[in-house]
Amino acid sequence: MGYVLKDCDYAISWVNGELRIIKNATVVIEDGLIAGIGEGAYSRGFENIDCKDHILMPGLVNAHTHTPMSLFRGFFDDAELPLWLSKIWNVEKELNHNIVSAASELSIIEMIMSGTTAFTDQYFYPQATAEVVLKYGLRAALGPPFMDTMRDPKQVENELRNFASEYASSQLIRPIINVHSVYTVGRDTLLRIKELSDELNLPIHIHASETRDEVYEIKSKYSVFPVEYLNALGLMSSNLQLVHLGWVTNWELGIIAKAGAKVIHAPTSNMKLATAGHFPMRELMDMGVIIGIGTDGPASNNSLDMFREMKMAVLLQRHSYWDVGIKAHHVFRAATINGYTILGLRGGCLDRGCVADVVLLDSKNPQLQPLRTDNLLSNIVYSVDGSSVDLVLVNGRLIYEKSRDYYALRERAVRLGKEINEFIGRFLP
């Protein structure tokens, strides 16, 4: 089975590692992969999709989020992080499979409609989220979270083993080891997590150096900073994904680079929660570290729109550095090809053999005008938002077509919102 995406006004993507913009492009998709650009497959009986008045680009990867936390959108929004977390954690003790499923579905609808084709998620009841992922057909990296302050680590390990076994051969679900943080997970559990990562060959995904309080707490307890602590325990490797890093020291950057660990920047959430600090994007890039971008959860962002997040990442870096060293192509790479690298997939590009996760934007959208080859990338990063998305394919399957799905998904989102309000209303003042 395949598609011919025919006569796109523009195709913008990474081809052989270089950013290319191709006018009047035709892209062939076969068996879930990119088969080529401009290569005829019309005789194979593939379905042609007329892409006139559209821009073809790779799907966006949300490299860190908490999908079911649409449950908490607008919940104690203006509280600082410690108070906000205490309110959230109080409600999370009452969660169940059904409410996590409903909240996951609401978020996944939002992601699909705004051009996200894959995401990494850290939350409770990952089975509920996985079921919704498979229903809608996008990709996700998932796994039960280790968080000793709330859950028995032995129980989490059993859940992880079952989850990893169930989805070991899935094309869309990638099991991961989720770890909340070094301040909620004890030393013995972290050592066990390292053993599990080696045994199961699964990546570890963890919040690290997010706040000043976290850094001071770990330094006070162990006489080292969080990244140093993880390194001392043997967790620092190419299988480690570090989220936030707003309060990381210069020498810890060298540890990250040497280990080949991946990092994820979540700018909007960090600003909204007033965690301050600074994500050292330029220094990490100069060291060759792979950087992804994530929205964080819809409770702390409050949007899951990766177009907005790309723009915010550039703006925050420029505000911090007082220059324009971080450019549109840096964050476009982070949200596409780097995101897929973090997932362990060859994607985010139009090379032959890349996974066929692509998005079509409406090139007549006023946000994109005036439109030329020289300003196309700038317009995508700085001007548009997810409302420009007209069509989404994941794994070579058409999972969203605005003309077909838009109103039905909006109505479904409203119904899910009402279901969520029935649950969360019990915890409101």
Predicted segments with their positions:
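N-terminal metal-binding scaffold of metallo-dependent hydrolase/deaminase domains
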Residues: 1-43, 54-55
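Acidic, glycine-enriched loop/beta-strand segments at the rims
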Residues: 12-24, 273-275, 340-377
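Divalent metal-binding segments
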Residues: 52, 79-125, 181-189
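Active-site gating loops and adjacent loop-to-helix segments of metal-dependent hydrolytic enzymes
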Residues: 71-102, 109, 136-147, 212-239, ...
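Metal-coordinating catalytic core of metallo-dependent amide/deamination hydrolases
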Residues: 128-247, 251
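His/Asp/Glu-enriched, well-ordered alpha-helical/loop segment
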Residues: 232-239, 281-364
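C-terminal cap of metal-dependent C-N hydrolases
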Residues: 355-410
